[in-house]
């Protein structure tokens, strides 16, 4: 028999083990449940996590996890998967779940580029009932539906979102509010209907007025802003000014002692270099400031230009077109004439011209530095501009062309006058008009390839969607098609813009040196085309537009746009009537910004508009040289130029906003 104390000891050990086993047996066998989801809060986890929780959860929480999964899928850029989950949401939802469903509907529509549906979904929400997280998403979706178009609704969304943000996001909100304001014309900002209780919005508009009235003088601007802060001490921008405004106030202009002008003075491009140089000299000497009140001058008898043949826009030699007797449309764009001359460089500044066709670029840059130049304008040809990266120079450089891949250099800006540049501006303009599916109708060949790629890239950046392309042959093919009565069916193919691009050719004033990029295309698309951007000569356009009209009814007809390639001197009244409704872009100088100067320069170049455009480029080269520091240092800085409204991108690539005109009843009218 075991001793009593041993039995008691063993029993004392066994009983707790049995009790623990009984306790564990009563516990559930699966892992502990995750905390209940909060659909009104943040969605920080991955969509995979939320989808897994949805599969494992009970019916009570299943819809919450699914709503979070949809939001996470949208954050990850997976709109198709988000749409699939959205369509399987249960019909019976709580009030909070229905509210989140409605907000997700707006976000999903915006992600699918259906801005009308997104706006409709937002309008059904009670903003006051939303959580702070939901309010932030509500305003972000409102901002997205504006698609970059400045409006009072966009400003109100930024203002409402501002108290919800902190740190870098708060500063970014102030910067974007200011950007939207500065993108408005004075007429647009002056016409804003501000309610009596919108003190913050009124403060923003007053700050804009102070900036516009004093931006030529940093000292005056600083004083005006200080007065503004006194009047609006609690305004969010009174504590932290927008970054761009701070840069303007703190801007320190750099001095320019001498300019080196790099141009090809021999070879095919000589005629273009001559036009640029003449425009540059005219702007430097202040001649364009007096052109508006002086009589047109006779064409010069320069033997270097006499008897030359102008390359046409397709790269072949052609005679200059006949004179165009009709007056240019009166544009709303202000004349750019004296602005840079009065506020910029002195007309007595030394300028030395270097011939890039006679020696290597590296030698010229070294020589220019030794000659005391502090600013280089040029080179002009794209292959020479590409060499700048491998030939670094301490000099500030305003290149007159743009490489395919721009690398940010602290001392280089790029100013190009090319059909690709014009196509990028057209994509922005067409997108701003609310079009959803544009088609680029371009000629077969290298020029068409490059324009299609440039337009498609810009369109994708604006909308996140693909543009369509369609090609046509020469005038003989077009005539054969129109004689057959077949018309032109718009059947585009989506352009898949290649990220790896070969070096493109150079087009200067119509001279093309090809090195093409072949855009890739997928299956044909014919429906929902609401805009057609046509790259054609006047003769080609006179055939293409009637063929489009022949195949489409007036109700289903897409809006038609064209490039400056279609506009030249000598277009008669029959052509203008045939082009009814078509919109096209061109430089302000040819759109009537300065009619007297246009008449003078057109006469000087025998109505060859390609050379007039290069003359305007020379004018703007002087303007940009006068404001090189602002363009290089102040993001978004704008200058009214002869080739467009000039502004600098992040890499100091000069963007040109062109003037758009439209044919109406045989007349040219500005597109406002």
Swiss-Prot record:
GO biological process, one term: regulation of cell shape
GO cellular component terms, semicolon-separated: periplasmic side of cell outer membrane
Predominant subcellular localization, coarse grouping: membrane
Top-level taxon in the UniProt lineage: Bacteria
InterPro entries recorded: LpoA, Peripla_BP_I, TPR-like_helical_dom_sf
Membrane topology according to the record: Lipid-anchor
Polar residues bias (residue ranges): 305-322
Gene Ontology molecular-function annotations: enzyme regulator activity
Keywords assigned by UniProt, alphabetized: Cell outer membrane, Cell shape, Lipoprotein, Membrane, Palmitate, Peptidoglycan synthesis, Signal
Annotated Gene3D superfamilies: 1.25.40.650, 3.40.50.2300, Tetratricopeptide repeat domain
Biased amino acid composition, Low complexity: 327-336
One Pfam family this sequence matches: LppC
Region feature (Disordered): 298-336
Localization (cell): Cell outer membrane
Lipid-carrying residues in chain (S-diacylglycerol cysteine): 27
Lipid modification (N-palmitoyl cysteine), residues: 27
Signal peptide interval: 1-26
Subunit text: Interacts with PBP1a.
UniProt family annotation: Belongs to the LpoA family.
Functional summary from the UniProt entry: Regulator of peptidoglycan synthesis that is essential for the function of penicillin-binding protein 1A (PBP1a).
Protein name as it appears in the record: Penicillin-binding protein activator LpoA
Originating organism: Pectobacterium parmentieri (strain WPP163) (Pectobacterium wasabiae (strain WPP163))
Lineage: Bacteria, Pseudomonadati, Pseudomonadota, Gammaproteobacteria, Enterobacterales
